Amino acid sequence: MKLHELQPAPGSRKERNRVGRGIGSGNGKTSGKGHKGQNARSGGGVRIGFEGGQTPLFRRLPKRGFTNIHRKEYAIVNLEALNRFEDGTEVTPELLLETGVVSKLKAGIKVLGDGELTKKLTVKAHKFSASAKEAIEAAGGTTEVI
C-alpha cells in the first residue's frame, strides 16, 4: 500500500446533499420544504416548547424560588482523601491545592465525613461537617476553622 492509495473506510464519509439544484436531484425546486407555509419560509418554524398557540406548560406553571446571589460554593474534601498525608501533617487549603486533592479553592474548603481517617492530622479549613470533625478528633487530630 502506498500513500496515494489510502482511502477512507467505506461508509465513513457521506457526500453533502446540495438542495435546489434541479428536479433530477430529488431535492430541487422547493428544496425538500414542500409548498408555502411557515416551515417553507426563511427563519420559519416554531420555537422550542411551542404548543400551537395554547399557553405552553412553562407559562402555565407558577414561578418558584430565587437564586441566592450571595451563595458560597466550597471545595469539598472527604476524610478518605486526607489519608494520603503523613501522621502529624498540618493540612491547609494551600497544601490540598498543591497535592491536587482540590483543583480550585472556590470560596474555601469544606471537609466532609465520607470514608475512614487513620492518620493523626491538624486540619485547617473554612468549614467542617459534624461527622468529619468527630472523626478527625477521634483519630487524635485537631480541627481549626480559618
UniProtKB/Swiss-Prot annotation:
GO terms for molecular function: rRNA binding; structural constituent of ribosome. Keywords: Ribonucleoprotein, Ribosomal protein, RNA-binding, rRNA-binding. GO terms for cellular component: cytosolic large ribosomal subunit. Pfam families: Ribosomal_L27A. InterPro entries: Ribosomal_uL15, Ribosomal_uL15/eL18, Ribosomal_uL15/eL18_sf, Ribosomal_uL15_bac-type, Ribosomal_uL15_CS. One of its GO terms (biological process) is translation. The keyword Nucleotidyltransferase does not apply. Gene3D superfamilies: 3.100.10.10. The keyword RNA-binding applies. Residues 1-51 are annotated as: Disordered. SUPFAM superfamilies: Ribosomal proteins L15p and L18e. Residues 21-31, 42-51 have a biased composition (Gly residues). Disulfide bonds: none annotated. HAMAP family: Ribosomal_uL15. Part of the 50S ribosomal subunit. Belongs to the universal ribosomal protein uL15 family. Binds to the 23S rRNA. This is Large ribosomal subunit protein uL15. It comes from Anoxybacillus flavithermus (strain DSM 21510 / WK1).
